[in-house]
């Protein structure tokens, strides 16, 4: 599921990204400079982004399961592009629902 999320993120497939976030007011996403609470708020934010997502290289990915219905995915990445080699971190908490695995909490930030 993480690979599907990553492909949607890099490809800016908003429909898949919206699908993979739990459709709940309890879902949250802490971004680089913003906080979003609830699936609807996250969806509005995502719709405001440019159509092309910045390229990135995954440096390290750690996926850990806790039982059969709960997991975390943590990534260290490097932004690609003209003179931009920032190192970032992304954390996701995944929960298995009746619809499948969904992100219930996410955080993304850069290392200063």
Regions found by a protein language model. Give the residues of each.
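Short, aromatic-enriched amphipathic alpha-helices that serve as compact interaction elements
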Residues: 1-12
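Short, well-ordered alpha-helical segments enriched in acidic and aromatic residues
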Residues: 11-26
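Short, well-ordered beta-strand segments in beta-rich or mixed alpha/beta enzyme
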Residues: 20-21, 28-30, 70-80, 91-93
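A short gly/proline-enriched turn/hairpin at secondary-structure junctions
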Residues: 26-37, 47-52
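Short, surface-exposed beta-strand-loop junctions and turns on beta-sheet-rich folds
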Residues: 36, 79-80, 109-110
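Surface-exposed, charged secondary-structure patches
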Residues: 41-84
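Short beta-strand edge/turn micro-motifs at domain boundaries
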Residues: 87-112
């Amino acid at each position: 599921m993480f690979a599907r999320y990553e492909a949607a993120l890099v490809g800016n497939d908003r429909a898949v990204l919206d699908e993979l976030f739990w459709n709940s007011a309890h879902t949250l996403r802490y971004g680089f400079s913003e906080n979003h609470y609830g699936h609807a708020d996250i969806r509005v934010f995502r719709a405001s982004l440019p159509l092309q997502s910045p390229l990135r290289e995954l440096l390290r990915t750690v996926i850990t399961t806790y039982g059969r219905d709960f997991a975390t995915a943590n990534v260290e990445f490097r932004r690609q592009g003209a003179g931009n080699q920032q190192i970032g971190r992304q954390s996701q908490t995944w929960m298995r629902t009746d619809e499948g695995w969904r992100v219930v909490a996410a955080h993304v930030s850069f290392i200063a």
